């Protein structure tokens, strides 16, 4: 497991004991990022069918998935986390298969009433973009 994934798992804002819900998992996701989040929280990731409150959410998003569907997914995910719980969209890096257009996540976030931060590298092939509700600062 690489050092970038380890460092960035902490930057996600997750803590030991946090329940992190994972949306839209597929076999192309970064397993090192998933493992580091699980190591950091000392919990398994739960899927979108988990029916209790969670402390944070990661959403794996790829080009070809509908932007309106992303906005709906963001709103659904935001509904299961606490007011300040971390919410991340993970996308393939530019130039990688499935990389969305640069404004796709920002547009969907705005539609969902959220601000999108600058992407950060979470693994060799994936970037992460943290979303926050409008008016919640940095």
Where are these regions (language model features)?
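S-adenosyl-L-methionine-dependent methyltransferase catalytic core, i.e., the SAM/SAH-binding region
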Residues: 1-138
